[in-house]
Amino acid sequence: MNKTDELRTARIGSLITPPSLAAEHPVSPAIADNVTAARKRIACILTGEDHRLLVVIGPCSLHDPKAALEYAERLNALRRRYEDRLEIVMRAYFEKPRTVVGWKGLISDPDLDGSYDVNRGIGIARQLLIDINALGLPTATEFLDMVIGQFIADLISWGAIGARTTESQIHREMASALSCPVGFKNGTDGNVQIAVDAIRAARASHMFLSPDKLGQMTIYQTSGNPHGHVILRGGKQPNYHASDVAAAAESLSAFNLPQQLVIDFSHGNCLKQHRRQMDVAAEVAEQIKAGSQAVAGVMIESFLEEGNQKVVSGEPLVYGKSITDPCLGWQESEKVLALLAEAVSHRL
């Protein structure tokens, strides 16, 4: 009989189970407390009970644990300085959606060479999340793969569904099961309605099929996630201006949803020019100063060194510089946080 299945499978390997990974990289009670407390604070910001500003800031993607932890230590000092006005959460992205092809993140390919040592990558990612949370600094990530969350979601205080997957039914179902607040980005073309629809979908109960913590395929029934929100990330044109925020808030209001939202300073809003994140920050700071309650949070791409670099086989990488999207450097990151903290002082 002719074989009819797995005709295009090149390799199959065994993946560590979530309990085995958790046993190798356990969560302490103090870290668990840090995660749950941060989730509660973020939820209060997203419902308008807390008028501070959520700031999700960090590298486009993480590829070097040492540089990531140094960045986290610096950021944590600023978190403590501004905690009366800003809820600073470190962007810790281990999965990268690609428009066509490219490096898909530290979990998939930790050695940056196409060897796909996923078991090693997922261990590095989990330990790094533990180390960052141990500082007292909460972490945020994008949930892209439907299985990866089983390995790291217990360490995440805020999650995002990206522009390419906001309209995906399975990602909306996954968001309904996640224990943290989840932001949905508008589409790559700027369509905000798909993010509003995603929030509505994620608030509902869903049934979907997924492996459980032991790897057994399971029928999941979710209770829904009440803390979904829109992330304005730009599209064919930027959408961070006051008129854009008002239009998005009106779309949310039409369905009796909380009108608080997050503005991404990068991607379409900075026209893919990383330095323009500072211009976006200045405009959004003015909205906050003017008393806008709709701007509940912002996202910023930032690392130790400005810009980005290509991975070239046999050549060393610049320490602390992104290998995906270009980022603000540390000095500009300090400036943007000071600017936002000062703006929030006017609305508290």
Swiss-Prot record:
GO terms for biological process: amino acid biosynthetic process; aromatic amino acid family biosynthetic process; chorismate biosynthetic process. Keywords: Amino-acid biosynthesis, Aromatic amino acid biosynthesis, Transferase. Pfam families: DAHP_synth_1. It catalyses: D-erythrose 4-phosphate + phosphoenolpyruvate + H2O = 7-phospho-2-dehydro-3-deoxy-D-arabino-heptonate + phosphate. Gene3D superfamilies: Aldolase class I (3.20.20.70). It is an enzyme of class 2 (transferase). It comes from the Bacteria. Pathway: Metabolic intermediate biosynthesis; chorismate biosynthesis; chorismate from D-erythrose 4-phosphate and phosphoenolpyruvate: step 1/7. SUPFAM superfamilies: Aldolase. One of its GO terms (molecular function) is 3-deoxy-7-phosphoheptulonate synthase activity. InterPro entries: Aldolase_TIM, DAHP1/KDSA, DAHP_synth_1. One of its GO terms (cellular component) is cytoplasm. Its EC number is 2.5.1.54. Belongs to the class-I DAHP synthase family. Stereospecific condensation of phosphoenolpyruvate (PEP) and D-erythrose-4-phosphate (E4P) giving rise to 3-deoxy-D-arabino-heptulosonate-7-phosphate (DAHP). This is Phospho-2-dehydro-3-deoxyheptonate aldolase, Trp-sensitive.
